[in-house]
Amino acid sequence: VSGHRVYLAGPPFAEEYRRRASALVLAAGWEPLDPMRRDFRGNTEGHEAEIVLGDLADIDSCAAVLADFTRPDEGTSMEAWYAHSQGIPVVAYTGGQWAHPWTVYVSASVHNVLEDAVAALAAALGGVPA
């Protein structure tokens, strides 16, 4: 597991989150891993296993998960649960939205502001230097 890779979990069409999160994670000295680099939007039928197994492998290769919980998304929830079940810390970003009990349970910390969530990655990563 790389000590410096952060998986960017979030809804498929959350381009602004992915852009901002990638920039903030890079600025902190870590490598963002965006699963949407394998873009199956509008073409998921017949590719379900490839999508899920690719996402799971990506999560396994990361030291932490930054999860966009600003709106409900099944994939984000499943990715966060999987990471949590594997002992990979999850930091949740809610954008001020209510945090579901499951979000709180699987997350090392929950933040309304994306910058605060990225700052919290250092604690989630056990002080891995930026």
Segments the model singles out, each with a brief description of its role:
Residues 1-130:
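Conserved catalytic or regulatory cores that recognize and/or transform ribose-phosphate-containing ligands
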